[in-house]
């Protein structure tokens, strides 16, 4: 596989202290205007600790890291071996911090983008049967 390089500029970072929050960099603070507590957002993260040539070549994984699950393409899983979108609920906004319940990312993970998540446009009816066959 040959990869073409391009640059992604982080707009903030995941922080895990007493609370979990997204710290938006000062130069992107204006982009938070209109975001309200209770809004759902979609985060685009860069799993910087999984960014190696070897891990980038992984295209199939066992979901949930369980070898009893069949090998599945990474785009059909939540594997951390490439950038993943996550959805979290905004609980509180203070200055350049967006507080959230939890996130499956490490402290210091770069946030590439944040988008409002209007359910009526982005959330099709859930079909839980497609993942119910997988083992945790």
Curated annotation (Swiss-Prot):
PROSITE patterns: TSAA_1, TSAA_2
Residues annotated to bind S-adenosyl-L-methionine: 48-49, 78, 106-109
Pfam families named among the record's database cross-references: TrmO_N
Record keywords, A-Z: S-adenosyl-L-methionine
Residue ranges of domain TsaA-like in the record: 8-126
The family this protein is said to belong to: Belongs to the tRNA methyltransferase O family.
Name of the protein described by the UniProt record: Probable S-adenosyl-L-methionine-binding protein PH1056
Organism name: Pyrococcus horikoshii (strain ATCC 700860 / DSM 12428 / JCM 9974 / NBRC 100139 / OT-3)
């Amino acid at each position: 596989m040959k990869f073409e390089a391009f640059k992604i500029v982080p707009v903030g970072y995941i922080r895990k202290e007493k609370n979990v929050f997204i710290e938006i960099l000062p130069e992107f603070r204006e982009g938070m205007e209109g975001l309200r507590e209770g809004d759902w957002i979609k985060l685009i993260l860069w799993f910087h600790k999984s960014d190696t040539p070897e891990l980038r070549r992984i295209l199939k994984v066992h979901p949930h890291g369980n070898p009893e699950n069949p090998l599945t393409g990474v785009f059909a899983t939540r594997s951390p071996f490439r950038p993943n979108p996550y959805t979290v609920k905004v609980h509180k906004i203070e200055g350049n911090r967006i507080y959230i319940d939890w996130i499956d990312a490490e402290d210091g993970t770069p946030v590439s983008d944040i988008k409002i998540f209007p359910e009526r446009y982005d959330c099709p009816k859930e079909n839980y049967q497609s993942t119910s066959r997988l083992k945790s």
